[in-house]
Amino acid sequence: MKKRLVVISDLHCGHEYGLTPPDWWYNPQTEHAHIRKMAQFQRELWGFYTKAMDDLKPIYALVVNGDSIEGKGERSGSTELNKDARYEQIDMAAQCIQYANAKKVRIL
């Protein structure tokens, strides 16, 4: 029996352009053009990710190869974070990883 290994990296959960599960999406019904753009991007990226994972299932092992969360956002002065609390970033990354429904998960 073949076993599928999938490697993902650079989720950057917590960054405006990072992978964002639905629980943390921006509301697209806003007057702010930047937020509307980000709301659309979040949905498109999540749709791409979930379709790719669904196409790859069943996944035996998932390797998460770094940068699951954005962290403090020091380079941008935290201006590009959609969630600055790292515990929320961790929850976001956990949802992304759990979506794969892999039998084994290794985070490097």
Locate the predicted segments by residue.
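Eukaryote-skewed repeat-based solenoidal scaffolds used as protein-protein interaction platforms
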Residues: 59, 91-108
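N-terminal active-site segment of His-dependent metallophosphoesterases
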Residues: 1-92
